[in-house]
């Protein structure tokens, strides 16, 4: 399941291109993912409680189907992606200009994501476009939440579990 199809963020990227604003990628290159999976030093970046939240989010995001021995490597990839995006944000800084990071909710969380990799002197604000009334966004520390109409309920995990194994949507 492609969580970030181009159609979801194309309007933001294309508006920036049309306005002549530089657009840069910030994700961790695929070539560095295997090394990140094995980099246990990443485990120390977050406090233990936050690392536990990140583990839960990764497990849930993979529909509970990730084998236990693959969970921490996937958490490390998430942490490495956040670090890579933070470096891209810092590298894009220009005096008097704003840097906009377009990323998923897990990456913009102040307690788990990219902001944890930014230096203390760096001022950042978080805006979330939220479909419906998801408690995670409402309870987040975002500076701004832009509400959009709720999406139709869908079990995104059903295709991963296989035919006949769908669970009711909550």
Where are these regions (language model features)?
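A substrate-binding/cap region within the structured catalytic cores of diverse enzymes
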Residues: 1-94
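Glycine-rich anion-binding loop/nest that anchors nucleotide
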Residues: 73, 77, 96-107, 125-128
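C-terminal regions of proteins
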Residues: 84-93, 107-170
């Amino acid at each position: 399941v492609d969580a970030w199809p181009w159609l979801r963020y194309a309007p933001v990227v294309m508006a920036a291109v049309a306005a002549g604003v530089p657009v840069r990628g910030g994700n961790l290159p695929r070539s560095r993912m295997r090394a990140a999976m094995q980099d246990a030093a990443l485990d120390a970046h977050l406090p233990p409680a936050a690392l536990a939240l990140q583990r839960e989010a990764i497990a849930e995001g993979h529909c509970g189907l990730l084998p236990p021995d693959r969970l921490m490597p996937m958490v490390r990839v998430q942490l490495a992606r956040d670090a890579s995006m933070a470096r891209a944000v810092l590298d894009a800084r220009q005096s008097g200009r704003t840097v906009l990071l377009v990323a998923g909710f897990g990456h913009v969380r102040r307690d788990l994501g990219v902001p944890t990799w930014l230096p203390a002197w760096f001022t950042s604000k978080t805006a979330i476009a939220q479909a419906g009334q998801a408690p995670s966004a409402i309870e987040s520390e975002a500076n701004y939440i832009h509400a959009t109409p709720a999406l139709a309920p869908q079990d995104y995990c059903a295709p991963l579990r296989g035919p006949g194994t769908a669970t009711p949507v909550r």
